[in-house]
A protein has these predicted regions:
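N-terminal Rossmann-like NAD(P)+-binding subdomain of aldehyde/semialdehyde dehydrogenases
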Residues: 2-147
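Conserved small-residue-rich beta-alpha loop and adjacent elements
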Residues: 137-176
Length: 176
């Protein structure tokens, strides 16, 4: 094949559009509605398709989270910290990809996007470090009137829904 034909073939190639799926219970199911919506960057340029979730999808996510709750709340603080630290390691390993995607999605310069990604990674490490310390800081004996003891200890309590803010979505999602 000649160089001219090779260049023409590359230019005529269609790009493959990314359509994301949900992440529920360790799997990537399609939305029950089968619908998607466009995700655009700060300038309105198309980035990807995202699933438009239905009530059933939300219910399935809550059921899966409740199913996983026993294992998560039963894990030691040290183990939970190791899991959070592993998330930070994985983000660090794909830092360049996250910097590129945050810059595209939010219309930021590479340096500002890198600062946001670095702050998000640092925050995961910070959270991981606090998992085995929070009980000593927040929990403990509470003074009460009379011959009683009032002890408190923080424990996981259940399913939480988190929505990322419109501005600074990646760092905002990690910070919530």
């Amino acid at each position: 094949m000649s160089d001219k034909n090779e260049k023409t073939e590359k230019n005529e190639r269609l790009s493959v559009f990314k359509t994301y799926k949900l992440y529920v219970g360790g799997k990537f199911p399609r939305s029950e509605s089968g619908r998607v919506y466009e995700v655009t960057d700060a300038k309105g340029k198309w980035l990807a398709n995202a699933p438009q979730s239905s009530r059933k999808d939300a219910r399935d996510a809550v059921v899966a989270a409740r199913k996983a709750f026993g294992a998560w709340s039963g894990a030691t603080a040290y183990n939970r910290g190791q899991i959070l630290y592993r998330i930070a390691e994985m983000l660090e390993g794909r830092r360049d990809q996250y910097v590129r995607e945050v810059a595209e999605a939010e219309g930021l310069s590479k340096s500002r996007a890198a600062a946001q990604v670095d702050a998000a990674i640092d925050r995961w490490v910070w959270y991981a470090g606090w998992t085995d310390k929070i009980a000593q800081v927040v929990g403990g004996g509470n003074p009460v009137a009379g011959p009683f003891f009032n002890l408190s200890s923080p424990e996981p309590t259940g399913v939480v829904a988190v929505l990322a803010p419109q501005e600074s979505s990646f760092l905002g999602l990690v910070s919530v």
